[in-house]
Amino acid sequence: MSFQTLITASELDHLCRTETDVVILDARFHLDNEDWGDRAFAESHIPGAQRASLATDLSGPIIEGVTGRRPFPASADFERTVRSWGVGPSTQVVVYDADRGLMAASRVWLMMRWIGHDAVAVLDGGLPAWESAGYPMTAEATSPPAPEQTFVASVRPHLLAEVDEVDRVRVDTPIRVFDSRGPEGYHGQGKYYDPVRGHIKGAGLADRAETLDDDGTFRSPEDLRVHYDALRNGQDAGEIIFYCGSGVTAAQNVLAMEHAGLPGARMYVGSWSEWIVDPDREVEL
């Protein structure tokens, strides 16, 4: 049995003690301080974990006037990264984050699936859940895996939505395109990382924070199904597209739908930061 959406702290502890083909990834990241995750990892991490940096491992080159702030890397580049982590065809990958468990972890989950690896799960509740349960942390450097695994990418482009499709369906009824940033970002308020404020014209709001309970773990599949059934309004899950500021946190909604037994939702990787590079694309507050 593999874990393909979420894994609890106790399940991860058991996995570490009973299985050998397991790769743990630390994806901690802070938008205001991109070096913070690297420093936090060096100070303390789950034993055996390796670093998965949003800035260097999980993002490709920015093309001015074309891409958003966090484009996916080329599949061949990410394949090499996955191999360097020691991931093979049957490896169970577990990824964790801080700050209620989700900043970049859900993006890693989606990227692993995009490149063809299903045995990947996010630590439910993130590092706070692991630490509050009393499980160990270490500052010891993790030895690089040897030999490098022979993971071969099998890209699934259907897991993502491109800008042309988003532009085509954004005014559909019922709503198909949803902004994951929360009410402030949706309405162009609060702190912004892009020069234009607002949201894609016609998009609905699907605040990613609503997928979590007060303790930072995901709501139950039953609760999430009710939540997403209201958003879908009778549509198939595969009709739904989520975006955010730069294609990172929107993956949390995709993961939550999968956890709820509603597979097929997609993420628009370019998100708001790509949408606004073309002044002819419509926006609203």
Features from the language model and the residues they span:
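Cytosolic catalytic domains that perform sulfur/thiol-centered chemistry
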Residues: M1-L285
